[in-house]
Curated annotation (Swiss-Prot):
One of its GO terms (cellular component) is cytoplasm. It comes from Acinetobacter baumannii (strain ACICU). Belongs to the class-II aminoacyl-tRNA synthetase family. HisZ subfamily. Pathway: Amino-acid biosynthesis; L-histidine biosynthesis; L-histidine from 5-phospho-alpha-D-ribose 1-diphosphate: step 1/9. GO terms for biological process: L-histidine biosynthetic process. Heteromultimer composed of HisG and HisZ subunits. Keywords: Amino-acid biosynthesis, Cytoplasm, Histidine biosynthesis. This function is generally fulfilled by the C-terminal part of HisG, which is missing in some bacteria such as this one. This is ATP phosphoribosyltransferase regulatory subunit. Required for the first step of histidine biosynthesis. May allow the feedback regulation of ATP phosphoribosyltransferase activity by histidine. InterPro entries: aa-tRNA-synth_II/BPL/LPL, HisRS-like_core, HisRS/HisZ, HisZ. It comes from the Bacteria. Pfam families: tRNA-synt_His. The gene is hisZ. The keyword Cytoplasm applies.
Length: 388
């Protein structure tokens, strides 16, 4: 193996250098503080767990199982998984480790690992930050979570030009149930909706039970008024469909009231991981970026695998994506070598003010210190900081 080969990193992973690492860490700290004052308590979860725990969502979210790295535990011989998402771990905490009665709010930040990138040009080792609310199945809880997500993105990135998409899997799911479709028909419809293939959708729904309703769902996915006008009276009377539609309307109205300058849209056939989500879904997008800045939704019953099914809603984002193309201007104060008490006190005082101070070692000079922008100099018996 040549020396150059030892420099190579696997596809989809990268070093984060000081100019950007400083930005990322600032985002992380500010985000955790933002969530903390809203009642979201920080938890740390292990990087590895037995695969049975991490795969607690595998039946409802097979994508998660596919992106989870698996290794053999050298101590027990059991199969371990490297976390690809922290939500199953927080669900375990809520269900078993810290079974709070009533509403529980958690937040987290840490590296997760994926077997393959989740979208174009994405890292396989995102720095995932998220917040979750357990124990309340109300619209108010959903609105709170969307509101918190938007506030966090506004602080960490910007909402200027951003677009919020709202959807509700209950519309599609209740229509499928009402029509009595087979699993194959359900999967085919989901694929057509995801591809926005209206001509194919029109052809496929011609001989489908409730076909005109399924076509209307795709054709008028972004206009609730037009959608209602083209749906049959039968499905509009269905209790589950009506509840989902009203929940989406109410959420849309409340979010628009809270964020009047934000561009908010509807997409009732945005069915990413619809087997995993159980209600409202939301994602916020920035201009000229295909992947969402943050996304989330309702996933009731997530703790059932751990013996305690509870209502739950939450969102997550990748701090690396939020900090992309942002670079800190690093400033460093260079102090001369020496052990004099007044010099050491001057260095300590500067550091207490939040300044980065590096003291020269041995034969070092200014040229040996990266990012040297200022120096500590002795003038008339006083140590002063001067720009280089």
């Amino acid at each position: 193996m040549t020396i150059s080969e030892t420099w190579l990193l696997p596809d989809g992973v990268a070093d984060v250098l000081p100019e950007q690492a400083q930005v990322i860490e600032k985002l992380r700290r500010e985000a955790i503080d933002f969530l903390a004052v809203r009642g979201y308590q920080l938890v740390y979860t292990p990087f590895i767990e037995y695969i049975e725990s991490l795969s607690s969502l595998s039946e409802s979210n097979q994508d998660l199982d596919l992106v989870t790295f698996k290794v053999i535990d050298q101590l027990s011989g059991r199969l371990l998984g490297i976390r690809a998402d922290m939500t199953p771990q927080v669900a375990r905490i809520d269900a078993h480790v810290r079974p709070v009665e009533g509403v529980a709010r958690y937040c987290y930040a840490g590296t997760v690992l994926h077997t393959k990138p989740q979208n174009f040009n994405a890292t396989r080792a995102p720095l995932q930050l998220g917040a979750e609310l357990y124990g309340h199945d109300s619209i108010e809880a959903d609105v709170e979570m969307v509101d918190v997500m938007l506030g966090l993105i506004e602080n960490a990135y910007t909402l200027q030009g951003a677009h919020l998409d709202l959807g509700h899997v209950g519309l599609f799911r209740s229509l499928v149930k009402y029509a009595g479709l087979s699993k194959n028909e359900e999967h085919e419809l989901s694929d057509l909706y995801q591809r926005k293939a209206l001509p194919e959708l029109a052809e496929f729904t011609q001989n489908l039970n409730m076909g005109s309703d399924f076509y209307a769902l795709g054709r008028y996915a972004s206009d609730l008024d037009a959608l209602q006008a083209h749906l049959s009276a039968d499905i509009l009377k269905d209790a589950e469909f009506d509840a989902a539609l009203n929940a989406l309307k109410t959420t849309l109205e409340q979010i628009k009231n809270r964020w009047p300058a934000l561009n908010v849209g509807i997409d009732v056939v945005e069915l990413r991981s619809y087997h995993y989500h159980t209600g409202l879904m939301y994602a916020v997008y920035a201009p000229n970026r295909a992947a969402p800045l943050a996304q989330g939704g309702r996933y009731d019953g997530i703790g059932e695998h751990f013996g305690r099914a509870r209502p739950a809603t939450g969102f997550s984002c990748d701090l690396y994506a939020l900090g992309a193309n942002q670079f800190a201007e690093i400033e460093t104060v260079v102090a001369p070598k020496g052990t004099e008490a007044d010099l050491l006190k001057a260095i300590a005082n500067a550091r207490s003010e939040g300044l980065r101070v590096v003291q020269l070692l041995g034969n070092d000079d200014l040229s040996s210190i990266p990012y040297a922008t200022h120096q500590l100099v002795l003038q008339n018996g006083q140590w002063n900081i001067e720009k280089i």
